[in-house]
Amino acid sequence: MIAHRPFIPTLLLPLLALTATAQVPEAEPTLSGEMTLSQCITYAQRHSPDLIPARVQMEQLEVQEESARMNFLPDLNAGVGQNFSFGYTQGHDKVLRKNNGSSTGLSVSTSLSLFEGGARWWALKSSREALESKDYILDEVEDRIALTVASSYVGVLLAQQIVEVAEENLSLSLMQQKRVDAQVEAGKLAPSEQLKMRTQVGQDRLALNEAKSDLDRAMRVLRLDMGITEEGETFTVPQEDPESVIARLERESPYHAAPEWTNPSLRLAQLRYDLSSYDVKRAKAGYMPRLSLSGGYSNGYFYYFGDEIPNKSFGDQLKSNGQYTIGLSLSIPIFNRGQVRASVRQAELQRESALGQLIQQQFSEQRNITLATADLRKAEESYRLSKDNVEVAQESLDMTEKEYNAGRITAYEWEQSKNKLIGAKSQYLQSVYTRLLRSINLTYYLTGTLPR
């Protein structure tokens, strides 16, 4: 991530469990023991396969910039040729003589483009600006990876708490089963009530097994989002009390954060529009004449077979056959079947398309902020309602427990009250971690900070 981004809000610090200061580089995370959200994201941003296309694209920008610079240098070419000729020639005395021989030619030539309508200059300027902004390509991918891993990580935290609720549910059912068994033995309840309770315990065991399976699946999703495919590489996610998470969220709200940054996706859209303007100028350079400078040196050696024509020595021929050339070439476009005009129009259409994409990206950023704000407010309201619901359900179960012990209600009514409490706790946990994830998203959209 680029250096100008602000630090992580304090509401995320305990969740991330950062152990190093901002001045100390973070060590390479290893897949062992407990891994915090920060470590999971750091690992994913170094090992995710999503980084491969971004790195290739960044390398392509470097190659394009180097190629644009090299276009200002002259061309240098060397050539060598060997020819053989056979036949007769007629001299001044009307006599035919054999003219069989060979010729060897050597040449070195160079050319330099002096003016091309500014095409090379615009290409260089475009490639340099693209290269200077290459970090945003990596930032965009890293941010997407971080948001994905954060969502998966929060999913694991929620799944862990759901398992605890399922275990509590089973524990209550087992306790109730013992009481029902005792009442059946005492003749206070029919044996059918005992069978009903056993059925309920079996259902609660199944619910616990499903909760553990969901936790295992959530861990697998997190591993895949981190780029981990080897089954032997294991780690765990530390559990945290939901109320401690809410306490931190209450201390710092992202609502008042000023959007003082620009999303990498928006910067890339702006860059594509700026570069498209250079493409239009490069295309219009095709209307301009082209001036080039060329020069060269050539030499040759001739050898005649036979005695009819005497051969000069190799050294004498090199002294007398050498030739230097230098010249200017001006090419003025007159008619090229409308190719330049078509290229200009195509470049202008691409610029209009890039402008449309930029406007769409700007709208998308504002839309994300608006919806993220609404989602967080909804999550906060759901949290408050679900918390009140848990308190009411717990109070109801306590009262039901007393009435059941007094013999005023049946085991079925007690079971109904217990199920309402378990359902209320599940909704409460869902609201807690939904609020946490919504807070992470809104903080990112407003400030660009992400768990690192």
PLM regions and their residue ranges:
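Sec/SRP-type N-terminal targeting helices
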Residues: 52-56, 69, 100, 114-142, ...
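Small/polar, glycine/serine/threonine/aspartate-rich low-complexity segments that form flexible
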Residues: 24-33, 79-112, 240-247, 281, ...
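Bacterial Sec-pathway N-terminal export signals of envelope proteins
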Residues: 22-77, 81, 230, 237-279, ...
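Bacterial N-terminal signal peptides that target proteins for export
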Residues: 1-11
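Short segments within alpha-helical structural elements
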Residues: 206-228, 390-448
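Bacterial N-terminal signal peptides
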Residues: 9-19
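Periplasmic alpha-helical coiled-coil/stalk elements that build and connect Gram-negative outer-membrane
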Residues: 35, 144-260, 375, 379
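Short flexible linkers and secondary-structure junctions
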Residues: 24-155, 291, 295, 338-341
